[in-house]
Every structure is written in structure tokens, then in C-alpha cells.
């Protein structure tokens, strides 16, 4: 008994010490810098020119990066806390107010994991690349670090630099390895994304220099600033344009079908799985979190734009005869649910938007990978030129069917849960009038009805449509290879897992989403003249007026120190 009484406190102390070390370890900086450093080592890898050695090296770097992000989640992240965790802060250029500040909360941590996971699979999907393989894998690894940085940095000026970092690799991946119109698609991509990102820089400078003195661009500082309503509205409008291009929001979407139409399978996976999520994440992080009063007034517009995305993109996808462009417009349609969820003032609806980003990242990556695999066999993207290949590619047909069912939100798949959460969250959101909720829900349901029609008809045309004799007779239609089955299986495991037990993912961000919604609810109640047609009038209470800003939640390290 004496031995037990002595050893128990020692074990507890050792456990706390271990937790403290894990929380203070620079997990996020390592996950950002490791793939970037690995990218710069690629030119020194001995290779015979076909990329056989380079691709193994790149796969190893991508897998280690994924394991680093998993370790960060397991050993340094506490899902029950809503505040910033895994914090690292180094004063970089103090005169300019630029700080290397990284951290993660429930809004960013799931997307960091998604980024490293999709990138590792994209490297495996790039196995057949033999044209300039060193440059190709260099760009993929550089994108890995840059995209993780977008979700992890906690300084707005540093965020802008990370946002710009991933533009050049995508441009080169499109311009060098794309299809016949690759130069047009790459140029259009860089004009849209680089041009719109200037708004991020302008808003960052305006918010950082707000109030005079030494500029400070850190999120924690900006969240405590008392920005005027007019200032918030201007900043919100600029950021909505910048992030709306990346999401993308109609009519700022036209670069995406062109980019997808010319990209290769691994680039497809990065575009659909990660790049679009950067726009949704940024809307949550900046527009909803840092500019709550402006968000309360812009929220109805986000919901209307979300419905436009859903219906317009679904109808356009229905009319597309090019397989890549059909799936591209389908992606735009599904991202409309993210806008509706972000515009919702309910925790369920906003949580659904977060889950929809994760779900669509997985489903979109799987569909576009299958598009690339199918093109490698048929050498055509026109649906009327396909048909009758189902008998020779039965495994491929099975993979296509499962992924298409996930995209059309079949119960038991992640897409069903996320869209249902958005629908129910918005329908029960009493911040909006009943008429507005009924109209929006009814219109959004049109997209839900159209999705299975164009996806299932697409499958019928590809595999069981009118046979193309030249394709069936003279083309070596090889069925799915083990590598391809493995990639799709890796994506289907979380898709089905989240669909059957959503708490596998929702528990990781619920606390942060609830804090975000609470902040926006308080901002909504401070608005004096809400729109009578869309937003219900709210009564201002003394408790709300006396608390203009929410307190910063203690970090993981502070909690451990208190223990």
C-alpha cells in the first residue's frame, strides 16, 4: 500500500511532464518545413530520368509529414478545448510586425490532417509520371508544406505569404503537365487567384495597422480589436472576393472547370481535396471569426450565394459532356452547402459546413482520381465516345459506383451526414425568418435532387452506354490496378467511417465551432437594423452590450501548466 501511495503521484507527474513536452514540441513548424526541405533535396536524388527513385523519396517525405500531423493531433491537441493549441511564436521581423506564429484549433486541425493525407495519396497517384519527375515531385512537396501553413499560421501577413506560396506550384503543374489547353487554364488560374489575393494583403495591412503604433497581424490581437462596423464591412467585402475565388463562389468560379479540364490526376486531387477548402476555411477564420458584426450582415448573402452555387453548378454539370468538367461543376455545387453552413448562426449548421469541407475533400479527390484513371485507359473525356467498357473494367465500375454514391449523399456516407447537418442546422436557425428558411431549403433541395440524376446517368453512359466499337475493340482496357484500388480504399475508409459514426470527426472541432457561433450570435444581437426580410429582429440585452468581445480561451500549454 505504501509503495502504491508513493508511485501514483510520480506516475501522474511523469504523465503531466510528458504531456507538457508533447504540447511544446514544434509539431506544426515541423509539418510545414519538413516537406519544403524535402522538396529542395529532390534535385540531389540520383535518378535515371524516369523518376523511379524520386517518387519513392517523395512518397516517404509525404508519409512522414502525414505521420507528423497525426502525432500533433494525438499528443499535442485536445479536442475539448476551443482555443489555440500547439502554439509556436517567434518574432521574425519585429519592425514590420511579422511573427512566425503557428497554432491549431478545431477549425484548422482537421484540415491540416486532410492536407497531409490527400497529398500523400496524390504522390502515390503520380506514380506513372515520367516527364520531368524531379520538378513534378518538387512542386508537390512544396505545395504540401505551403498548404499546411495556410491552415496553421496565426499571423495574417504570414497567412498571405503562405496563400501565395501555393499559387506558383499549381500554375507550373497545370502549365507543364496539363492537357492541350494547359497554358490557357494555367494563366486563367493565376490571374484569378493572384489578382484576388491582393485583397488579402490590403485587408491584412489595414487590420494590422489599425489603431496606430507597431503593427500586429496576429489573429489573437486582431480578434480583440474594436473595429468599426463600416471598417468591418469594407474588409469583409474584400476578403469575400478573395476567398470566393478559391472556394469558388459563382460567378468567380470560371477558372476551376478550365483548371480541372487540363490537370492530371494528382493535381486534380490537390485542387478538389485541399485547394477549395482553403476558401471555406478562410471565410470561417477571418470573415466569421475576426469580423463578426460584418458577418452578421453578410450572412444572408452567403446563404443566397450558396443556393446559387448549388443550383447553377448542378444544372451546368447536368449539361456537361466532358467528364472532367462535369465533376468540376459537381464540386462547385457541393461547396454551396459550405456557404449555407457558414452563413448559419446555429452550431449544427456551421459544424455541417466544416464536415462538408472534409467530406468533399475526400470524395472529390476520389472522383477526380478515377477520372484520371479512366482517361489513361480510354484516352477520351467525351461521354459520347465512351460506352460498353463495363464488361472489361468491372473493378473500375465498382469503384466509380461507390464514389458516385458517396458524392450523391447516400446514407452511410460522409456526404449524407454533412449535408443533413447543414439542412437541419439552417432550417432550425431562428436567427432567420421562417419564410426565408423555407425558400432557401426548398431551392437547395433542387441541387440534392439533380445530383443523383447526373451522376448515375454519367455512370450509365461510361460503362453501359452505346458501345464505341473502336474503343472496345482496339483499346487495351485494363481493369483497376492494385495501386489504384489501394488509393480509393484509403479514401473510402474515412468516407464510410464518418458516415457511420460522424463523431469520429465532429468531436475534433465541436468546441471551436460552438465558440465561433457564440461570437457571431453576440454580434448579431448588437446589430441595430437587421434585415426584416431575412433576419429576425433581436432585442439587445445589457449583458450583450456590456461584453463587446469574447475572452481568449486558454491554450493547451496554459491548461497543463495550471495542472
Curated annotation (Swiss-Prot):
Keywords: Membrane, NAD, NADP, Plastoquinone, Quinone, Thylakoid, Translocase, Transmembrane, Transmembrane helix. It is a multi-pass membrane protein. It catalyses: a plastoquinone + NADH + (n+1) H(+)(in) = a plastoquinol + NAD(+) + n H(+)(out); a plastoquinone + NADPH + (n+1) H(+)(in) = a plastoquinol + NADP(+) + n H(+)(out). It comes from the Bacteria. It is an enzyme of class 7 (translocase). GO terms for molecular function: NADH dehydrogenase (ubiquinone) activity; ubiquinone binding. The chain crosses the membrane at residues 25-45, 56-76, 90-110, 111-131, 133-153, 157-177, 189-209, 230-250, 264-284, 298-318, 335-355, 356-376, 397-417, 438-458, 485-505. GO terms for biological process: ATP synthesis coupled electron transport; electron transport coupled proton transport. Its EC number is 7.1.1.-. InterPro entries: NADH_Q_OxRdtase_chain4 (IPR022997), NADH_Q_OxRdtase_chainM/4 (IPR010227), NADH_UbQ_OxRdtase (IPR003918), ND/Mrp_TM (IPR001750). GO terms for cellular component: plasma membrane-derived thylakoid membrane. Its main location: membrane. It is found in: Cellular thylakoid membrane. NDH-1 shuttles electrons from NAD(P)H, via FMN and iron-sulfur (Fe-S) centers, to quinones in the respiratory chain. The immediate electron acceptor for the enzyme in this species is believed to be plastoquinone. Couples the redox reaction to proton translocation (for every two electrons transferred, four hydrogen ions are translocated across the cytoplasmic membrane), and thus conserves the redox energy in a proton gradient. Belongs to the complex I subunit 4 family. This is NAD(P)H-quinone oxidoreductase chain 4. It comes from Prochlorococcus marinus (strain MIT 9313). The lineage of its organism: Bacteria, Bacillati, Cyanobacteriota, Cyanophyceae, Synechococcales. The gene is ndhD.
Amino acid at each position: 500500500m505504501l509503495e502504491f501511495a508513493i508511485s501514483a503521484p510520480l506516475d501522474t507527474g511523469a504523465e503531466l511532464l510528458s504531456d507538457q513536452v508533447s504540447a511544446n514540441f514544434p509539431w506544426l513548424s515541423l509539418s510545414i518545413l519538413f516537406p519544403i526541405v524535402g522538396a529542395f533535396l529532390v534535385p540531389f536524388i540520383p535518378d535515371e530520368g524516369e523518376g523511379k527513385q524520386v517518387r519513392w523519396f517523395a512518397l516517404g517525405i509525404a508519409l512522414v509529414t502525414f505521420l507528423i500531423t497525426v502525432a500533433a493531433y494525438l499528443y499535442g491537441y485536445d479536442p475539448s478545448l476551443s482555443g489555440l493549441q500547439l502554439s509556436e511564436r517567434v518574432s521574425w521581423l519585429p519592425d514590420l510586425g511579422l511573427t512566425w506564429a503557428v497554432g491549431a484549433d478545431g477549425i484548422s486541425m482537421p484540415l491540416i490532417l486532410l492536407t497531409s493525407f490527400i497529398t500523400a495519396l496524390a504522390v502515390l497517384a503520380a506514380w506513372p509520371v515520367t516527364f520531368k519527375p524531379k520538378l513534378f515531385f518538387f512542386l508537390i512537396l512544396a505545395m504540401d508544406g505551403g498548404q499546411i501553413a495556410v491552415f496553421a499560421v496565426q499571423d495574417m501577413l504570414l497567412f498571405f505569404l503562405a496563400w501565395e506560396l501555393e499559387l506558383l506550384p499549381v500554375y507550373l503543374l497545370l502549365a507543364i503537365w496539363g492537357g492541350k489547353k494547359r497554358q490557357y487554364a494555367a494563366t486563367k488560374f493565376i490571374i484569378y487567384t493572384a489578382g484576388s489575393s491582393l485583397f488579402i494583403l490590403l485587408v491584412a495591412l489595414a487590420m494590422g495597422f489599425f489603431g496606430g503604433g507597431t503593427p500586429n497581424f496576429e489573429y489573437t490581437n486582431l480578434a480583440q480589436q474594436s473595429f468599426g462596423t463600416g471598417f468591418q464591412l469594407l474588409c469583409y467585402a474584400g476578403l469575400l472576393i478573395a476567398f470566393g475565388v478559391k472556394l469558388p463562389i459563382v460567378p468567380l468560379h470560371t477558372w476551376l472547370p478550365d483548371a480541372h479540364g487540363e490537370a492530371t490526376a494528382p493535381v486534380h486531387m490537390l485542387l478538389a481535396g485541399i485547394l477549395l477548402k482553403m476558401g471555406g476555411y478562410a471565410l470561417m477564420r477571418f470573415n466569421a471569426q475576426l469580423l463578426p458584426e460584418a458577418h452578421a450582415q453578410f450572412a444572408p448573402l452567403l446563404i443566397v450565394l450558396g443556393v446559387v452555387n448549388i443550383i447553377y453548378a448542378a444544372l451546368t454539370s447536368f449539361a456537361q459532356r466532358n467528364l472532367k468538367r462535369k465533376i468540376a461543376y459537381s464540386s462547385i455545387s457541393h461547396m454551396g452547402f459550405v456557404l449555407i453552413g457558414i452563413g448559419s448562426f446555429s452550431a449544427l449548421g456551421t459544424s455541417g459546413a466544416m464536415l462538408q469541407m472534409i467530406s468533399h475533400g475526400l470524395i472529390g479527390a476520389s472522383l477526380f482520381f478515377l477520372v484520371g484513371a479512366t482517361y489513361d485507359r480510354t484516352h477520351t473525356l467525351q461521354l459520347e465516345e465512351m460506352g460498353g467498357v463495363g464488361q472489361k473494367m468491372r473493378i473500375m465500375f465498382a469503384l466509380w459506383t461507390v464514389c458516385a454514391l458517396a458524392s450523391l449523399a447516400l446514407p452511410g456516407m460522409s456526404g449524407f451526414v454533412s449535408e443533413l447537418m447543414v439542412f437541419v442546422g439552417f432550417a432550425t436557425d431562428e436567427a432567420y425568418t421562417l419564410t426565408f428558411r423555407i425558400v432557401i431549403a426548398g431551392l437547395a433541395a433542387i441541387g440534392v435532387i439533380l445530383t443523383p440524376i447526373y451522376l448515375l446517368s454519367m455512370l450509365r453512359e461510361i460503362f453501359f452506354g452505346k458501345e464505341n466499337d473502336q474503343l472496345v475493340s482496339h483499346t487495351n482496357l485494363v481493369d483497376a490496378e492494385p495501386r489504384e484500388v489501394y488509393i480509393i480504399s484509403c479514401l473510402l475508409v474515412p468516407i464510410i467511417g464518418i458516415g457511420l459514426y460522424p463523431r469520429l470527426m465532429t468531436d475534433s472541432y465541436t468546441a471551436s465551432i460552438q465558440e465561433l457561433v457564440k461570437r457571431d450570435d453576440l454580434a448579431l444581437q448588437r446589430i441595430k437594423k437587421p434585415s426584416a426580410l431575412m433576419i429576425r429582429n433581436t432585442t439587445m440585452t445589457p449583458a450583450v452590450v456590456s461584453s463587446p468581445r469574447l475572452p481568449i480561451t486558454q491554450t493547451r500549454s496554459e491548461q497543463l501548466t495550471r495542472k
